[in-house]
Amino acid sequence: MILLAWLLTMLVVFIYYCKDDIYNTTLLQDGDTSDYIIVGAGGAGAPAAARLALAGHDVLLVEAGGDIPGMAVTLLGSDMDWAYPTILNNISCRSSLDQQCRLSCGKCLGGSTTINYMMYTRGNPRDYDDLGIKGWSWNDIVPYFLRYEGLEELHRLPTTSIPHHNTAGIMKLGFFTESGNPWHSSIIQGLKALNFPFNSDMNGDSQIGVSQVIGYVHEGERMSTARGYLARDDVKRVLKIAKDTQCTGVIFDDNNNAIGIKVVTKNRKGNKTLRLYARKEVILSAGTIGTAQILMLSGVGPAAHLNSLDIPVRADLPVGENISDHVLPLMYIPVHPGFAARSGDLFKPVRDMVEWFISRGGPAASNGVTDVTAMFNSHCYDFDKRKLIHNSLDCELPNLQLINAFIEHRQIQGLEVQVQKSSGLSMDIIQQLQVANQHQAILVTSPVVLRPYSRGTIRLASADPLKHPAIFPNYLSDERDVQEMLCSIKILEHLVETPEYKAYNASILRLRLPGCPDFSCDREGYWTCYIRHMTYSSFHAVGSARLGAVLDEQLRVRGVARLRVADLSALPELPRGNTAAAAIAIGERVADFILQDAAS
């Protein structure tokens, strides 16, 4: 019955999303030429392409994936997800499938804005001011957040938030529909009991506190960059889009000018290799992993590594170095089944989807409790008094974020394969979760380290452009990241002991994990071991083609000409928040750089 309910829900979703393609498709021919070629139709690539095309330029946007399918969670691990495997380091992700951390990344129009959890957080002004890069201070970048922001419910924010927002931008943003899940308010009340202030706007004067965040949602539907930029009638009239077209390298002339790209197009008849040319510039927006791979395949990267693969070196640059990512330990809190959102009603998802189709409302227009989040500085938490304190400016700089999800009572029963595909967890962990979920709903509250110290690398596994690169995220290699997670788990232990949580028998699930000490004998040892087993990526990797080392201040690749990078790989450090906002701002920013150069 559980599997039947799941299949019916997916059938309803499939019927809705098998509608006519609303995005134009360009049929490519070998040798086609455009003014600008942009590789990757994701968070940054779609805005950049749309802005340049609307300015009157001949723009080709190529995307390795295809059209946009349905619901966010079902897409993780699907064909619309690159689902990059990684090289294990034996100290993280030990209870993931094959002990490999998996990096999800959208492989479709809109990229990761099509499969993420839709949270709109810009980060902290210090994230940009501390870079020390000319033209990339907070005051330089915030106009680009405002340019695309079209906040539809400004009246729900305090008047102090008005200067921080725009209501007329191209990306319509708003609050999620109330899910009906009582934990939505209970999480907030529990954190308030620990003196976390309620913050009505994490993009306003302060990030600190617990909040219901603004999301990339409009009229009950996801607002990806594909929907916000590419689906506009004025954009469709002027922008060329090539789907299912994977870039395999940049073409250079003898003077190191980027003059085009090599691609592989995919269709029912098989793969076809083409060469496409740009009169003016090539812009790589393939994401932190994809952009690094394309650069190295094209001879831009660490010389020793490229020489080892017999790739001619065009520019010896630290491509693929300094990778950082938001990482967390997955923490599960079983709660009394009477507090479950649907209390075992297996067919409620089908009814919810029907209600959504009719009215764009109801629980299916919500993202459950995912829009409830908290940011704080763990060094400003008094563990003896069990309260967050606010006694210095440093307390305004968060180092941790709590994110939430909810597994309803019996929701994952009989769905082992589906859960493993979407989560990447080992079957042993999934089966333990199923046992807990048989009798209780499960609140998932996980602490994200916002500025991790651990650094990883990306290298080519081979010179074959259709093979995944060798990704070594190296999570938890710096012990300071583990210590921050241990602090956050102690705060979670305090949280489940608040009256709001105790009323529903909430407790942190202590999973059986091989090699971990018994909790009753060694609490800290158990949680340290747990962290290394239950490591999970937020899919926010940055830094593989960073500003100041690989790129100049206008996102131009050093050592070559007519080639730029516009995606999260450009950021030397992670923003303190979800990264989609920064990616879109970078796309807007590179369009300005290019238009300014074209005008001069």
Predicted regions and their residues:
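N-terminal redox-cofactor-binding region of secreted/periplasmic oxidoreductases
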Residues: 2-600
